[in-house]
């Protein structure tokens, strides 16, 4: 990794993100996922659009250093079984996270919440499990389509550009560094109430931990599939289904419940351990333990 190149990329990725955070704070007063008023919609659209910032940072960094824009980033449409394995893993993790969330102190199933009641009313007699199934399936469809497109804007940077630049380093070392860069990149949104509305300052550091735990999983599938598209689909699907716990569990303490909470961290850690064991005992590639 060229230090000067990394600095240029970080400046191009972080400065526009800080501007986005300032604009959201100034014009919308923050991010409120529970509201549907004009300010909340503005904040949502602006924060969603910010996912394209890392893509632009990669493009301009490559142009500044006179290199091909997507050279070595792993953009390939060659399909293999790791595409659907990665896609299906995300809702499985979300459902396990939902179960673990219910085990957190003081958390219970939110069958009486307004969101759940509205969903159940729209589904007729399908019941709670039908609501969960439909929510999960809808999230999977969003994850492999529109969400994947936006996630690609980030993944070009994290699992494309940085993955390429950190080749030669130990897999887990690179994963931690990329996770830290990815996590802190979110700080303007976190301070505005994204993911951790109850604890925005502490949430900045929890988001870094979330990204550190999620990065090895996405990097593993990037390696196994041979394409950046798979982590983009996984990232998009994760974003789409990770909120199921926050809808179905109350009082939904953001430090405990859902993907960004303790429940999610436990599931991510177990998933990493599972992949490490599979990779060592079954595929015998030891990707987690070798260099990129």
Predicted features and spans:
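Alpha-helical transmembrane segments
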Residues: 6-18, 51, 85-94, 178-181
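Alpha-helical transmembrane segments of multi-pass membrane proteins
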Residues: 13-29, 97-102
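Alpha-helical transmembrane segments in multi-pass membrane proteins
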Residues: 19-65, 75, 81-91, 111-141, ...
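C-terminal membrane module of polytopic membrane proteins
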Residues: 200, 234-292
């Amino acid at each position: 990794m060229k230090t000067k190149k990394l600095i240029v990329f970080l400046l191009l990725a972080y400065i526009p993100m800080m501007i986005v955070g300032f604009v959201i704070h100034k014009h919308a007063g923050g991010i409120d996922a529970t509201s549907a008023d004009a300010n909340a919609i503005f904040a949502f659209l602006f924060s969603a659009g910010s996912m394209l910032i890392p893509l632009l940072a990669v493009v301009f960094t490559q142009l500044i250093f006179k290199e091909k824009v997507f050279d070595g980033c792993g953009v390939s449409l060659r399909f293999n079984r790791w595409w659907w394995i990665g896609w299906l893993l995300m809702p499985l993790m979300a459902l396990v996270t939902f179960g673990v969330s219910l085990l957190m102190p003081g958390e219970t199933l939110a069958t009486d919440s307004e969101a759940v009641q509205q969903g159940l009313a729209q589904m007729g007699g399908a019941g709670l499990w039908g609501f969960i199934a439909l929510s999960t399936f809808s999230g999977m469809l969003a994850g492999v389509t529109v969400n994947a497109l936006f996630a690609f804007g980030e993944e070009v940077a994290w699992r494309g550009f940085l993955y390429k630049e950190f080749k030669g380093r130990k897999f887990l070392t690179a994963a931690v560094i990329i996770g830290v860069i990815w996590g802190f990149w979110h700080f303007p949104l976190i301070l505005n109430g994204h993911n951790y509305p109850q604890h925005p300052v502490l949430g900045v550091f929890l988001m870094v931990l979330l990204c550190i735990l999620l990065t090895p999983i996405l990097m593993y599938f990037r390696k196994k599939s041979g394409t950046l598209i798979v982590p983009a689909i996984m990232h998009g699907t994760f974003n789409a289904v990770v909120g199921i716990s926050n809808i179905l569990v109350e009082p939904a303490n953001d430090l405990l419940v859902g993907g960004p909470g303790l429940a999610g961290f436990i599931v991510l850690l177990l998933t990493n351990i599972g992949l490490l064991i599979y990779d060592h005992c079954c595929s015998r590639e030891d990707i987690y333990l070798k260099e990129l």
